[in-house]
Amino acid sequence: MEIKLANPRGFCAGVDRAIDIVNRALDVFGAPIYVRHEVVHNKFVVERLKERGAIFVDELEAVPDDVIVIFSAHGVSQAVRQEADRRGLKVFDATCPLVTKVHMEVAKYSNDGCECVLIGHEGHPEVEGTMGQYDTANGGAIYLVEDESDVEQLEVRDPTRLSYVTQTTLSMDDTARVIDSLRAKFPHITGPRKDDICYATQNRQDAVKQLALECDLVLVVGSPNSSNSNRLRELAERCGTAAYLIDGPEDLDKSWFANCKNIGITAGASAPEVLVRDVIEGLKAIGASAPVELQGQEENISFSLPKELRV
């Protein structure tokens, strides 16, 4: 069995920054450091940070007074920010700058009283944070759609003043179809000048398509609650290749590889490379050869840390 590695794969700049913020805060201020929501959607990463003294909570009401709290890479609503300000909590914001870009778009539409459609997955923390940027006090409204059927049922107040934004970790192909449906139903709808789906999501989806065409089976390293990891698995399957989402080598099932000559491995944007290496070792133990790295899009993007943590 030959192993082929997608390129690029794994951590993106926003995830790197978010994890660095938690680690630097622990270095500078010591434990405990509170983090609202999992800083990134990966079990391994979260457990390592817990071991260092990070405490993950779902809501700010679980955070004591006079402590440091970090907002996750997925972003938070304005209501959460206001609560933190009201309580005087010291906040470090690990929101991905590309999510912040979407937040700013929504805030602009809100201030203009322009209705807004968000394409995204209901219940995902990024979606909750983005929806929470819209203030209906200016007379507008924000709507959430996930697929074309949602668009068919969508009714807005003024279709001549309507815009859309998207969650950053969606399937590019699915999102394009939803946007086409929106444009067909609401010809005056406008969108962002630059696509809201982030560069890392696009690059990893392009890479997994190539991987799926060259392999009998694709393994996506990532946690079940990772949106972008799930999209990679779905995309490989749509290419006609069997695909599995795994947290690590402990999830490997020998029966998957009975008739496989080429096994592809990729990783979601929140999955560390160490897990990929562990999976490779697990495959070698059942007869796989050394991995071959495929050609792919080079990434050299990085995001700066808050000033207090640049030590």
From Swiss-Prot:
Record's catalysed reaction(s): isopentenyl diphosphate + 2 oxidized [2Fe-2S]-[ferredoxin] + H2O = (2E)-4-hydroxy-3-methylbut-2-enyl diphosphate + 2 reduced [2Fe-2S]-[ferredoxin] + 2 H(+); dimethylallyl diphosphate + 2 oxidized [2Fe-2S]-[ferredoxin] + H2O = (2E)-4-hydroxy-3-methylbut-2-enyl diphosphate + 2 reduced [2Fe-2S]-[ferredoxin] + 2 H(+)
Cofactor binding note of this UniProt entry: Binds 1 [4Fe-4S] cluster per subunit.
UniProt family annotation: Belongs to the IspH family.
Species name: Saccharophagus degradans (strain 2-40 / ATCC 43961 / DSM 17024)
Gene3D superfamilies listed in its UniProt record: 3.40.50.11270, 4-hydroxy-3-methylbut-2-enyl diphosphate reductase, catalytic domain
Function: Catalyzes the conversion of 1-hydroxy-2-methyl-2-(E)-butenyl 4-diphosphate (HMBPP) into a mixture of isopentenyl diphosphate (IPP) and dimethylallyl diphosphate (DMAPP). Acts in the terminal step of the DOXP/MEP pathway for isoprenoid precursor biosynthesis.
Keyword tags: 4Fe-4S, Iron, Iron-sulfur, Isoprene biosynthesis, Metal-binding, Oxidoreductase
Biological processes annotated in GO: dimethylallyl diphosphate biosynthetic process; isopentenyl diphosphate biosynthetic process, methylerythritol 4-phosphate pathway; terpenoid biosynthetic process
Protein name (record): 4-hydroxy-3-methylbut-2-enyl diphosphate reductase
Gene: ispH
Binding positions for [4Fe-4S] cluster per the UniProt entry: 12, 96, 198
Catalytic site positions: 126
Annotated dimethylallyl diphosphate binding sites: 41, 74, 124, 226-228, 270
One MF annotation (Gene Ontology) recorded for this entry: metal ion binding
Binding site for (2E)-4-hydroxy-3-methylbut-2-enyl diphosphate: 41, 74, 124, 168, 226-228, 270
Domain of life: Bacteria
Pathway: Isoprenoid biosynthesis; dimethylallyl diphosphate biosynthesis; dimethylallyl diphosphate from (2E)-4-hydroxy-3-methylbutenyl diphosphate: step 1/1; Isoprenoid biosynthesis; isopentenyl diphosphate biosynthesis via DXP pathway; isopentenyl diphosphate from 1-deoxy-D-xylulose 5-phosphate: step 6/6
Binding site for isopentenyl diphosphate: 41, 74, 124, 226-228, 270
Keyword 4Fe-4S included in the entry's annotation: yes
InterPro entries in alphabetical order: LytB/IspH (IPR003451)
Pfam families linked: LYTB (PF02401)
Cofactor(s) it depends on: [4Fe-4S] cluster
EC number of this enzyme: 1.17.7.4
